[in-house]
C-alpha cells in the first residue's frame, strides 16, 4: 500500500504561486470563518444527538428492533457521507462549488430538523440518511474551496486549521447536545437550523472560484487536459481509509479502555477524553508550522500514532493510558491535515472536487468501519487493549513502508513547502 503513494511530480499543481484571494482583512476573515463553520456541520451531525440516544431508546421502546435502530440515527449520516462523497465531488466539478455548497447547506437544515415533526423511527432514520447526503456535499465543497482559494503554505495552514476546528467542535457539540437534550430528546435537532444563518452569508461572501480559474487558465487552453491522477489518489485514499481508523480509535474506544481498568466515573472518563482531544488540536497546530512536504511527514506521523497505541496496549494504569492516548492523538492531529494536503497537491482545479470527494469518502468510510474492525480484533486476541496494540503494529508497518517508498523515490530530501507570498 505505501508504495502506491509517489511523491508529487515536478509539475505538481501545488506550485508556489500566490494565493488567488486575499489572505488578510475582513473579507478574508469572513470567508475563512464560513468555510470553517461549514466544515464543522458534518461533525455536528455525527455527535450532537449522542447524549440523547438513551432518551430516544426509551421513547421508541415499543418499536420492534429499536435497540438496534436507534443507534443508526447517530451513525447513518456518516455512512451516507462515505458512500456519496465521490458523487458529490463529480457534481462539484460540473456544477460549481459555491452553488452546490449553498443548496446543500439549506437542505442540511431541512433534513436535520425533520425529526422534530416525525413520529416514526424509520422516517427519522431516513431523514438522518438525507442529512448525510447534505453533509457529503458540504464537506466536499468546503475542502475543495480551501484548495481553490489558497495555495502553498497558506493552503497547508488552513487545511490544518480545518482539522483544528472540526476536532474542537466535536467536543463542543457533544456538550451542547447534552445540555439542550435536557429539554427532551427532540430538542437538539433544532440546532441543525443554524445552517440557515450560514447559507446566505456564504452566498454573499464566498467568491466563485470557477470564474477566476477560467480567466487565469485561459492562456493554457491549448495544452492538453491531463488525465485524472487515479493511481496516486488511490494510494492516498487507501492510506486515508486506514488513517481514519487510527484517528477514531481513541475517541471511540477510550471509555471502554478506561472501564477495563476499573474506571466508571463519567467525570474521569470525560476528562481523559478531553485531554486526548486537546492533543489532537495541538497536533494540527504543530503540522501547520512544519516546513517540509506532507509526504515526508507521513511516515513520522504514522510512527507517532503507532507508538501511542503501543503505550496504550502496555498501560496498566490510568495515567499511562492517558499518556499513550495523548501521544496517539498528537499524531492523529497531524495525520488528518497531512493526508488531505498530500491529496490536494496532486489535484488540478478541474479535478479538485472529484478528488476531494474520493478522499472524504475514504476518510468517513474508515471512520464507519473503525469500531467494527476493533471489535473483530478484540474477539481475535481476547481484549480491547490487544486490539489497539495490533492496530499500533499495523501503523508502524505503514510508517516503515512509507519511509522505504520515499527513499526509493529519491524523496528523502524534498523541496520545502513554498513560503506565503501574500
Describe each model-derived feature in a short phrase.
Residues 121, 127-167:
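Cytoplasmic helix-loop-helix junction between adjacent transmembrane helices
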Residues 52-83:
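Extracellular/periplasmic helix-loop-helix junction of adjacent transmembrane segments
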Residues 107, 111-114, 122-131, 319-327:
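Paired small-residue
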Residues 152-154, 161-211:
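Helix-loop-helix hairpin linking two adjacent transmembrane segments in secondary transporters
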Residues 344-382:
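A late C-terminal transmembrane helix in Major Facilitator Superfamily
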Residues 82-122:
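Conserved MFS/SLC helix-loop-helix module at the cytosolic interface between two early adjacent transmembrane helices
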Residues 294-339:
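C-terminal transmembrane helical hairpin of 12-TM major facilitator-type secondary transporters
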Residues 83-96, 282-295, 378:
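Helix-to-loop junctions at the C-terminal end of transmembrane segments
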Amino acid at each position: 500500500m505505501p508504495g502506491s503513494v509517489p511523491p508529487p511530480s515536478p509539475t505538481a499543481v501545488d506550485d508556489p504561486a500566490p494565493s488567488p484571494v486575499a489572505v488578510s482583512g475582513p473579507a478574508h476573515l469572513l470567508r475563512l470563518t464560513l468555510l470553517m463553520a461549514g466544515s464543522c456541520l458534518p461533525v455536528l451531525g455525527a455527535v450532537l444527538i449522542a447524549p440523547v440516544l438513551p432518551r430516544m431508546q426509551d421513547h421508541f421502546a415499543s418499536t420492534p428492533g429499536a435497540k438496534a435502530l436507534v443507534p443508526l440515527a447517530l451513525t447513518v449520516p456518516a455512512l451516507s457521507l462515505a458512500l456519496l462523497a465521490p458523487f458529490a465531488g463529480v457534481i462539484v466539478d460540473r456544477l460549481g462549488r459555491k452553488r452546490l455548497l449553498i443548496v446543500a447547506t439549506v437542505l442540511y437544515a431541512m433534513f436535520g430538523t425533520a425529526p422534530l415533526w416525525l413520529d416514526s423511527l424509520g422516517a427519522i432514520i431516513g431523514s438522518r440518511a438525507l442529512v448525510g447526503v447534505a453533509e457529503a456535499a458540504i464537506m466536499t465543497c468546503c475542502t475543495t474551496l480551501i484548495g481553490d482559494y489558497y495555495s502553498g503554505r497558506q493552503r497547508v495552514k488552513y487545511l490544518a486549521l480545518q482539522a483544528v476546528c472540526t476536532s474542537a467542535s466535536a467536543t463542543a457539540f457533544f456538550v451542547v447536545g447534552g445540555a439542550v437534550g435536557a429539554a427532551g430528546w427532540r430538542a437538539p435537532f433544532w440546532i441543525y437550523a443554524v445552517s440557515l444563518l450560514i447559507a446566505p452569508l456564504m452566498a454573499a461572501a464566498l467568491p466563485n472560484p470557477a470564474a477566476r480559474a477560467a480567466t487565469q487558465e485561459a492562456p493554457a487552453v491549448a495544452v492538453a487536459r491531463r488525465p485524472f491522477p487515479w493511481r496516486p489518489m488511490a494510494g492516498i485514499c487507501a492510506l486515508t481509509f486506514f488513517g481514519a481508523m487510527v484517528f477514531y480509535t481513541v475517541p471511540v474506544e477510550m471509555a471502554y479502555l478506561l472501564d477495563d481498568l476499573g474506571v466508571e466515573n463519567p467525570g474521569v472518563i470525560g476528562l481523559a477524553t478531553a485531554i486526548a482531544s486537546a492533543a489532537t488540536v495541538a497536533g494540527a497546530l504543530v503540522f501547520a508550522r512544519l516546513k517540509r512536504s506532507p509526504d515526508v511527514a507521513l511516515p513520522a506521523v504514522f510512527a507517532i500514532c503507532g507508538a501511542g497505541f503501543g503505550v496504550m496496549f502496555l498501560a496498566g494504569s490510568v495515567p499511562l493510558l492517558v499518556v499513550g492516548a495523548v501521544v496517539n492523538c498528537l499524531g492523529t492531529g497531524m495525520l488528518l491535515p497531512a493526508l488531505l494536503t498530500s491529496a490536494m497537491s496532486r489535484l488540478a482545479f478541474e479535478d479538485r472536487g472529484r478528488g476531494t470527494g474520493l478522499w472524504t469518502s475514504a476518510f468517513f468510510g474508515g471512520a464507519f468501519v473503525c469500531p467494527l474492525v476493533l471489535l473483530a480484533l478484540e474477539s481475535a486476541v481476547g481484549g480491547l487493549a490487544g486490539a489497539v496494540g495490533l492496530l499500533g503494529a499495523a501503523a508502524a508497518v505503514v510508517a516503515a513502508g512509507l519511509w522505504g517508498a520515499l527513499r526509493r523515490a529519491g524523496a528523502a530530501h524534498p523541496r520545502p513547502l513554498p513560503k506565503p507570498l501574500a
